[in-house]
């Protein structure tokens, strides 16, 4: 069957790319956890640029 003149070939795409997708997901997860840990640190807890700054009380 031809779709706009293109033939269908059984070329594997997902299987060879799976390690790269998993690696990207692991790096993304680690980056998010590191960012959250840095925002919760004592040094940046009351920084006005911190999006979570309003969640902490003045006793921190």
From Swiss-Prot:
Protein's gene: atp18
Name of the protein this chain belongs to: ATP synthase subunit J, mitochondrial
Recorded family membership: Belongs to the ATPase j subunit family.
GO MF assignments: proton transmembrane transporter activity
Protein source organism: Schizosaccharomyces pombe (strain 972 / ATCC 24843) (Fission yeast)
Record-linked Pfam families: ATP-synt_J
Record's keyword annotation contains Cytoplasm: no
Assembly notes: F-type ATPases have 2 components, CF(1) - the catalytic core - and CF(0) - the membrane proton channel. In yeast, the dimeric form of ATP synthase consists of 17 polypeptides: alpha, beta, gamma, delta, epsilon, 4 (B), 5 (OSCP), 6 (A), 8, 9 (C), d, E (Tim11), f, g, h, i/j and k.
GO CC annotation: matrix side of mitochondrial inner membrane; mitochondrion; proton-transporting ATP synthase complex
Keyword annotations of the record: ATP synthesis, CF(0), Hydrogen ion transport, Ion transport, Membrane, Mitochondrion, Transmembrane, Transmembrane helix, Transport
Transmembrane regions: 13-32
Taxonomic lineage of the native organism: Eukaryota, Fungi, Dikarya, Ascomycota, Taphrinomycotina
GO biological process: proton motive force-driven ATP synthesis; proton motive force-driven mitochondrial ATP synthesis
InterPro entries attached to this UniProt entry: ATP_synth_F0_jsu
